[in-house]
Amino acid sequence: MSITAAQVNELRKATGAGLMDCKKALTETGGDHEQAVDYLRKKGLAAASKKSGRVATEGLVGSYIHAGGKIGVLVEVNCETDFVAKNENFQAFVKDIAMHIAAASPLYVRREEVDPDVLEREKAIYRAKAKESGKPDNIVEKIIEGQVNKFYADICLLEQPFVKDSDKTVQTYLNETIAAIGENISIRRFAKFTLGEGLAKKESDFAAEVAAAAGV
């Protein structure tokens, strides 16, 4: 059946979900408004965007240590109330995000944080490669757009596939947690530490070591 713009807008007002999510929900449920609301709630999409505008100043600084103490992560995740900060689901979310950062090594939380100069350099590389193919300019721009989105998905935490469920992104997991807990949650910042990173290891002279051991 055909889904009208009015149906999509009505569902969006009721749930706060995105337009494309609302359209998909209505399509999947045959245009039934109530079933579409339930569909979005099950997906963790209903009301998350409405809550996202509220200020979150409480929360936790979570940590994760991996590989015998050779990799460590600190992440700050904010919520609206101290009550939620003590919630087991919230604490599990913080732990999951710290673990994800350790495994996926993002550089930024969100795409808005990417240095514009870095982005422009990437675009220039993509544009040069795409033009070598001899494709029309409009196709080249679409190729560049796709490459930029892949670039964001590689380096931005919220756009990365979630390590415990690659069928969804970290953003989707965040939306699901917001919907389940009923409060705005925000991943503010993180830091990853790898033992010895940036240090130059002293290269040993094996022959000299043998000679020294032999007293030569």
UniProtKB/Swiss-Prot annotation:
Keywords noted in UniProt: Cytoplasm, Elongation factor, Protein biosynthesis
Domain of life: Bacteria
Cellular component GO terms, alphabetical: cytoplasm
Location(s), subcellular: Cytoplasm
Keyword set includes Cytoplasm: yes
Recorded GO MF terms: translation elongation factor activity
Entry annotated with the keyword Cytoplasm: yes
Role according to the record: Associates with the EF-Tu.GDP complex and induces the exchange of GDP to GTP. It remains bound to the aminoacyl-tRNA.EF-Tu.GTP complex up to the GTP hydrolysis stage on the ribosome.
NCBIfam families registered for this protein in UniProt: tsf
Family of the protein in this entry: Belongs to the EF-Ts family.
Annotated protein name in UniProt: Elongation factor Ts
Organism name: Geotalea uraniireducens (strain Rf4)
